[in-house]
Swiss-Prot record:
Residue spans of biased composition, Basic and acidic residues class: 259-271, 282-297, 709-720
Organism (species): Mus musculus (Mouse)
Complex and partners: Forms homodimers. Associates with microtubules plus ends; binds to beta-tubulin subunits exposed on microtubule outer surface at its distal tip; also associates with microtubule lattice. Associated with the gamma-tubulin complex. Interacts with the head domain of EPB41. Interacts with LYST. Interacts with CEP152 (via C-terminus). Interacts with STIL. Forms a complex with STIL and SASS6.
Region described as Disordered: spans on this chain: 67-123, 187-225, 257-300, 347-407, 425-470, 600-626, 672-735, 1105-1133
Residue numbers spanned by region Interaction with STIL: 887-1344
Gene Ontology BP term (one): astral microtubule nucleation
Annotated Polar residues bias: 211-225, 388-398
Pfam entry (one): Tcp10_C
Protein name per the record: Centrosomal P4.1-associated protein
Keyword line: Cytoplasm, Cytoskeleton, Microtubule, Phosphoprotein
Function: Plays an important role in cell division and centrosome function by participating in centriole duplication. Inhibits microtubule nucleation from the centrosome. Involved in the regulation of slow processive growth of centriolar microtubules. Acts as microtubule plus-end tracking protein that stabilizes centriolar microtubules and inhibits microtubule polymerization and extension from the distal ends of centrioles. Required for centriole elongation and for STIL-mediated centriole amplification.
PTM comment: Phosphorylation at Ser-577 and Ser-583 by PLK2 is required for procentriole formation and centriole elongation. Phosphorylation by PLK2 oscillates during the cell cycle: it increases at G1/S transition and decreases during the exit from mitosis. Phosphorylation at Ser-583 is also mediated by PLK4 but is not a critical step in PLK4 function in procentriole assembly.
Record localization: Cytoplasm, Cytoskeleton, Microtubule organizing center, Centrosome; Cytoplasm, Cytoskeleton, Microtubule organizing center, Centrosome, Centriole
Region (Alpha/beta-tubulin binding) location: 307-382
């Protein structure tokens, strides 16, 4: 996609590597350090760019396949390293630019054409060396020859690596497909279809958004899609995918993704999308956008076509990281400049006057003005279609032409700093809008490139969205690709109308896009359009170059930095086979096509020739293109025309062809002559782009005029449908688009080319679904077979310009078209080429703009390159731009001059067509595989859903189980906590001893208390009985008192009577005396006994009532005294006051019984003798003794209530009144005690005691100390003297209690023993013995 560096350039590229890549931290500048031979070959190829295009194309194809992988890897490492390539610019701003490039490698590449971005990593040193050599030497064909030889050498290596890459791609495809599918929606939404188309020129429509001049937008999209590693892989994949059928889709997607990554300014590169899904949707979106045919796309194509110089174009896309780094540097200045550019672009977008002022914009070189417009458009489209364009300034939001200009200015600024300084006049012209883009790029190079990429990628995204609308991402990818190809063809058709005036620019775009789509072959094709574009745009660029020079004077230092950056990017692009081949090869292809316009192998070259003739025949379109003031308006109009053509052509393959014819009306017509004309025009565009690239290297100013020319071409297309419809203008535009596409590819990035090619093939696939499969298959082969691709390009310059870009992306979509039908191929090629043309043109413009004379950029970093490359290439670019603008036929002549190489290219195109057919077949199989995979995925999703449900149920069940277990554990925890708390409360040994002692004390106290309670209860009962007895005695005494009172009264009466009668008185006195004596004795006895009893009990039980007892006790003496006194005739003495009932009873008995005599003893004892012989002795203390008549029975009643009876049988019964106990003593010595509680004790003479308790328990105490207790239930307990206890139960069991153990013997003979330590031993009658410990654990069990 980049112009191939000559061998000398490759050598200088190696020097450049050594000078520039001093450290791996320099991000992505030299991507393929691992392949020094490749770098040398690339350098040599750059040296031989002019001499042998096919060789160089082949070399770049080979080197690209190798270096793309390597380069992407280096880019990633370098980007990660983050070290800016300070050597590139002495200006401190350059390092920030490079760091930004590291951050946004894609953005910097997108400043360069997409192809260049794709290959910049590998080709940047080569491109820079190529620029140096081209600046110093202009033998492009020699360089091409050398490069071809080198490429042939490298092809072997590439082929070897293709297998590995294909395997990697197939593995990564599935991963990336998944990733891309998830990310399609996001990148697709970046920009509206309108803006995406605006960003993409009609040629750019086929190109992925990254192919647009706006690297920022491309980077944004790319970053959205994948990381750098993936994009790097995608680039490598693009090479390998071209060789494999499946890889073709992956490659398309990867390229598109790279473009998308570039749009996002991310280090991540779309190659991670090798799966192709992401790329295809984007191509679909781009296709939709191309169908819309927005003017902005045309304008952007014009802008990108502005980059005519090889230096500018390769520098732009040379190294993504590097450009991004440069963008980082430029971001600050670009932001300021973008503001100005936005205002200028708004003004320019409002009217053709503004568009006309574009050529006057500063920083413009040959083809740089158009590249700016393309960049500005892409940037503007991004601003409109995606919020990613926010980094773009309001100028981006302005009309597509303004935005494209600004965007291209950024590219130009990045590509051509020195050139800007050298050509301030042209820069002024273009700087009206593009300079704002430039300033914004310098200020925010990273953001600007990112915006460019975003603007470019959003269109691609839009195309994807449109394609998604048309069909599924992957399943409809092929159809979408065909539709994209058709749209791209439509776009070229639109481009060619304005290409009449700016044929070189349109071809530059087409070439740039073409390299993106075709890869190396696309690069070759795009290079020829670049030359053609250079010629066309030189006239317009002359005007813009002066203004650029004026502007370059003011910002020369910044432009130098940018130029260095772009040179470095070109060098990297040269190293990148696809990128470098795209631009450089396209220029050579333009030469070849000019030389061999009629030598095309397929009908497409004839159509290209006819288109070229139509372009020549249509001076209006060319004049419009040449008109730089109208360029902005024309570019916008072309964008609109392109959108119209795209929408018109998207309806059917024919419509697509018509759209492509609008870019290239010749291409739209299916006649072989027209096709040849179109191819010739494309060849011219390639040659122009080639020469313009060289002139760009020589003169940075030439870039922007060609961009302006492209804008004018857009305006011409817009102004007159004839331009869009004119086959000649369309063909020229296709060539210009090829140039632009080449330039854009080189400047933008490999990813740009990938996206663009993906779009192209999506259009082509939609237009020619059956053709796409074979072409994709062939493309996979051609992808790495650079020779074959270059040959095809030579055969069909225009077709190659288109197809090679697609092949770079798709493998061989172009070949597919060729194999199916020339018309179809032409249409698809045109579409592809249109998209590529837009990028190629953008790239050419970018080259014209961005790569200042190698003397400027390379002089800073490589003084050796300073003298020749810059002046020669610049002058050649100016002349070529002027020729391309003023004389499209001359470009065609140049292509005819290159007809020889074109013949070779035609042959390669034929090969590519066959490979495209193969790719189409492979795409069909891939579509089936995708359908199967989708069904499998659907099934998997269902299974996943079922599994999720089951998992949810299981989780619920597990959760429920967990909760239940948790509750159980909580309960157990509570129990355990209680247990532990209790365990904590367990006392220690000392405390246990104390507790035991206390318990013992408590037990003792309880026993004492029980004994006391028992005693208290007995005492209480006695006291109650005494109280009752006292109450009764008291009652008796009262009654006795009453009786005695009666006796006293009677005594008074008798006394009175006795006074009357002395005898009676004497008798009565004697009687009274006896009675008184008796009564006194009785009273004394009763009173004393009762009183003594009371006193005794009172003293014993109621000591507090001692006074009462004493009073009672003291009372009897008075009574007795009174009675004694009463004996002396004191009848009034109250003898009756202590009358007891027993006395009364005995008195009654005495009265009843006749008292025989009464004897009073000196001691106070009174003995009464009754007639029945019974004697009663009354003692003074109240004791009474009764003796029976026979003397055997004696009853003694003691004063305390005790009663002793001696029975006739000699039994002695003593009754203890206090204890209510009866003690019976038998003559044989047996003593029986009956207690009040019912207990009975028997004391036997042998000392044995038998106690019968109230419950009928009998306890026997033997004299030897043994005890035997018989309980009511029949249990017998025997206590031995040694303390052992034997218990015999009524059920036959027997227990033995000893101090050491307790044994129980069962009736069946079983013996169970419990020892003091708690062990239990059980012996069974069977002989079994079981021993347990205190806890119940079985220690031994003889039974098995």
């Amino acid at each position: 996609m980049f112009l191939m560096p000559t061998s000398s350039e490759l050598n200088s590229g190696q020097n450049f590597l050594t000078q520039w890549m001093t450290s791996p931290s320099r991000a992505g500048v030299i991507l393929n350090r691992g392949f020094p031979i490749l770098e040398a070959d690339d350098k040599q190829a750059a040296t031989n760019v002019s001499t042998s295009f096919p060789a160089k194309a082949t070399h770049f194809s080979n080197s690209f396949s190798i270096s793309s992988e390597e380069d992407s890897f280096h880019e990633e490492q370098k980007l990660e390293a983050g070290g800016p390539y300070k050597p590139w610019s002495e200006n401190p701003e350059a390092p920030p630019v490079f760091p930004s490039v590291r951050k946004e490698p894609i953005a910097s590449r997108q400043d360069a054409p997409g192809c260049q971005e794709d290959n910049n990593n590998d080709l940047t040193p080569h491109l820079e060396s190529e620029f140096k050599e081209v600046a110093n030497k202009n033998p492009l064909f020699k360089k091409l020859e050398q490069l071809k030889e080198i490429q042939q050498k490298k092809q072997e290596q590439l082929k070897r690596q293709q297998l590995e890459q294909l395997q990697r791609l197939m593995e990564e495809q599935e991963k990336l497909l998944t990733m891309v599918s998830a990310q399609h929606a996001f990148p697709g939404t970046l920009l509206p279809d309108d803006q995406s188309q605006k960003h993409r020129s009609p040629g750019d429509l086929t190109l992925p958004p990254h192919s647009y001049s706006n690297p920022t937008q491309e980077n944004s999209c790319a970053s959205n899609v994948l990381p750098d590693e993936q994009s790097n892989f995608c680039r490598a994949t693009q090479d390998s995918v071209l060789t494999s059928k499946n890889a073709s889709d992956l490659f398309y997607e990867s390229q598109y993704q790279e473009a998308h990554v570039k749009r996002n300014d991310l280090k991540e590169e779309s190659p991670a999308h090798p799966s192709g899904e992401g790329a295809l949707p984007r191509w679909e979106k781009k296709m939709g956008r191309s169908q819309e045919g927005k003017d902005v796309n045309l304008q952007k194509c014009g802008d990108s076509s502005e980059v005519v110089n090889i230096d500018e174009r390769p520098i732009k896309a040379a190294v993504r990281e590097k450009q991004q780094t440069f963008e980082d540097y430029l971001e600050e200045q670009i932001q300021l400049e973008e503001r100005e550019l936005r205002q200028k672009q708004l003004q320019e977008a409002e009217g053709p006057l503004l568009a006309k002022t574009k050529p006057k914009q500063p920083f413009l070189k040959r083809g740089e003005g158009l590249a700016r417009f393309t960049n500005a458009k892409s940037k503007f489209q991004k601003g409109k279609e995606s919020k990613l364009a926010s980094t773009q300034s309001p100028s981006e939001d302005q009309p597509g032409s303004k935005v494209d200009r600004q965007h291209l200015q950024r590219k130009t600024a990045l590509i051509n700093k020195d050139l800007c300084a050298e050509t301030p006049t042209v820069k002024k012209d273009s700087k009206a809008r593009p300079k704002a883009g430039f300033a914004s790029l310098r200020q925010k190079p990273k953001v600007t490139k990112t915006n460019m990429r975003e603007s470019l990628s959003p269109p691609g995204l839009k195309v994807q969205t449109g394609k998604k609308r048309d069909g599924q991402f992957r399943h409809q990818v092929k159809g979408e690709r065909n539709a994209h190809a058709s749209n791209k063809e439509n776009v070229p058709a639109c481009i060619k109308p304005w290409d009449a005036g700016c044929k070189m620019w349109s071809k530059t775009q087409g070439r740039e896009r073409l390299p993106l789509s075709t890869g190396p072959v696309g690069c070759v094709v795009s290079r020829s359009p670049i030359r053609e574009t250079d010629r066309e745009t030189e006239s317009s660029l002359d005007f813009s170059l002066q203004k650029k020079l004026e502007i370059w004077e003011r910002e020369k230092e910044k432009e130098n930095l940018e130029l260095d950056e772009f040179l470095f990017l070109e060098r990297a692009a040269d190293e990148i086979s696809f990128s470098s081949n795209s631009s450089f090869v396209l220029r050579i292809l333009e030469r070849d096509q000019q030389i061999c316009d009629g030598h095309r192998l397929s009908s497409t070259p004839v159509k290209a020739v006819q288109q070229r003739e139509a372009q020549q025949a249509d001076p209006r379109g060319q004049s419009n293109c040449s008109e730089i003031p109208r360029y902005g308006v024309a570019h916008e109009n072309e964008s609109e025309c392109e959108a119209m053509l795209l929408s018109w052509g998207s309806g059917s393959p024919d419509g697509l062809r018509e759209l492509s014819c609008k870019r290239s009306m010749k291409a739209f017509q299916t006649s072989t002559s027209e096709i040849q004309s179109q191819w010739d025009a494309r060849d011219d565009g390639v040659a122009n782009s080639d020469s313009s690239t060289e002139s760009e290297e020589q003169h940075d100013i030439t870039i922007k005029p060609s961009t302006e020319v492209g804008d004018r071409v857009f305006s011409n297309r817009e102004d007159s449908p004839q331009v869009c419809d004119a086959k000649g203008p369309i063909r020229d535009t296709g060539a210009q688009e090829d140039k632009w596409r080449d330039a854009d590819l080189d400047l933008s990035d490999k990813e740009c080319s990938s996206d663009e090619s993906v779009i192209v093939e999506s259009l082509n696939n939609k237009v020619l679904e059956p053709l796409r499969l074979p072409s994709s298959q062939a493309g996979s082969k051609i992808d790495f077979d650079d020779e074959r691709s270059w040959t095809d390009l030579e055969e069909n310059p225009y077709e190659h310009g288109v197809i090679h870009r697609e092949e770079a992306i798709y493998g061989t979509p172009q070949t597919q078209c060729h194999s199916k039908s020339e018309g179809c191929v032409l249409d698809k090629t045109i579409k592809r080429k249109i998209a590529p043309v837009k990028k190629g043109e953008d790239f050419k413009c970018d080259r014209r703009i961005s790569p200042p004379p190698p003397s400027d950029l390379m002089v800073k970093f490589f003084p050796s390159l300073k003298p020749k490359p810059k002046l020669d290439s610049h002058l050649e670019n100016e002349s070529k731009l002027n020729l391309s603008q003023d004389q499209p036929p001359e470009f065609m002549v140049c292509f005819i001059g290159d007809s020889v190489r074109s013949q070779v290219l035609r042959e390669k195109v034929t090969e590519l067509e066959s490979e495209i057919e193969k790719f189409k077949a492979e795409n069909t199989s891939l579509a089936k595989l995708r359908i199967e995979r989708e069904s499998a995925l659907e099934k998997l999703r269902k299974e996943i859903a079922d599994f999720e449900q089951q998992k949810a149920r299981e989780l619920a069940r597990i959760e429920e189980y967990r909760k239940e277990e948790t509750r159980k554990l909580q309960k157990e925890r509570k129990v355990f906590e209680k247990y532990t708390a209790a365990a904590r409360t367990f006392p220690d040994k000392k405390e246990r001893e104390e507790i035991q002692a206390l318990k013992q004390q408590i037990a003792d106290l309880q026993e004492d208390l029980k004994r006391k309670e028992t005693k208290w209860s007995s005492t209480q009962s006695r006291l109650r009985s005494q109280i009752e007895m006292l109450v009764k005695e008291n009652t008796d005494l009262r009654e006795e008192i009453k009786v005695m009172e009666r006796f006293r009264l009677d005594a008074w009466k008798r006394a009175e009577a006795m006074e009357n009668s002395p005898k009676a008185c004497q008798y009565m006195m004697a009687t009274k005396k006896d009675e008184s004596m008796n009564s006194s004795f009785q009273f004394q006895k009763s009173h004393v006994s009762s009183g003594v009893q009371v006193e005794k009990y009172k003293k014993k039980y109621l000591p507090a009532q001692g006074n009462l007892s004493r009073r009672i006790k003291s009372a009897p003496p008075r009574d007795l005294g009174s009675s004694d006194k009463g004996q002396a005739a004191l009848p009034r003495e109250p003898l009756q006051q202590v009358n007891f009932p027993d006395l009364e009873y005995k008195n009654k008995e005495e009265k009843e019984e006749e008292i025989q005599g009464e004897i009073s003893h000196p001691d106070g004892k009174v003995e009464k003798i009754y007639k029945n012989g019974r004697r009663v002795v009354l003692f003074p203390n109240g004791t009474r003794k009764e003796v029976s008549a026979d003397g055997k029975s004696v009853t003694v009643t003691f004063f305390n209530g005790d009663v002793k009876q001696v029975m006739p049988d000699e039994r002695v019964v003593y009754y203890y009144a206090a204890a209510q106990t009866t003690h019976t003593t038998y003559p044989e010595g047996l003593e029986v005690l009956h207690f009040s509680s019912g207990q009975i004790e028997k004391h036997f003479p042998d000392g044995r005691k038998e106690i019968t308790f109230p419950d009928q328990t009998i306890k026997t105490l033997f004299a030897d100390g043994q005890e035997e207790s018989i309980f009511p239930d029949g249990t017998i307990v025997r206590v031995q003297r040694d303390g052992n206890k034997i218990i015999e139960f009524n059920n036959g069991q027997r227990e033995l209690h000893t101090a050491q153990f307790k044994r129980r013997e069962y009736p069946d003979g079983t013996v169970k023993t419990v020892y003091a330590n708690g062990h239990q031993e059980t012996k069974y009658t069977s002989g079994r013995v079981r021993v347990k410990d205190k806890d119940g654990n079985v220690l031994m069990d003889t039974e098995m």
